[in-house]
């Protein structure tokens, strides 16, 4: 008899939809961001350096189909029969003219072995005409729209120059879910000014939204960002968790989350040459093992402290 899982894991979620192994391939489709080009603001979010999540095969000068083929070769040596999700990750992947967006998504879906899309975007970049198109696309392929939520506190969103309020996130998530589209969120735990109590309250706020999946990761200070300069000038404004502190925070956070939300990850690993701090020297699976060990010690599980 198998043990009850401590939390809902993303691989188990994918098994509900696919009878084979599935791997996401990150893409850089040449998008920018309304928080960089002046539409919403300039300079971007203070923590952001998109180099931190662009693999070597993922370059804007390469066509989407070529990025996917190179990504497939990167993964195929391990699982030759694997299928793939095209992950539009870098910048804001719904920011553009509708016909241009459709061409990009459909170019990805035309690649052999690609069985669906994951589209990362901002909650203030989901116009009605695009949402109608995605609603129809969702009838023919796997589709997950992943919103960068980052925080539920408007004070924090202003501080990191996010360019939208939490209510904008609420509206986007609810509109997307109402179209029958799987809807995910991404948050950063430990943004400046946020306490342990604030962060746990965030879990409660997110649990009220119709989210299917959630990614979280620790605040990382990245070279070349405005936040790195802020840290250099005022380090007292930041609390950078040590690994044990962050494990305990994640456990508390997960206990307050709605039990059915699928948890995709707890940490992120930025390239060594870009990372200022914290540097724990752990792989994702090593951190996950620490979380699972701590949850077992505390008899914790996802949703244990969840209140509707």
Give short role names for the model-derived ranges.
Residues 1-85:
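N-terminal [4Fe-4S]-dependent radical SAM core
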Residues 45, 109-114, 201-216, 287-301:
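Structural recognition of alpha->loop->beta junctions
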Residues 75-77, 104-112, 132-142, 174-178:
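Acidic (Asp/Glu)-rich catalytic clusters
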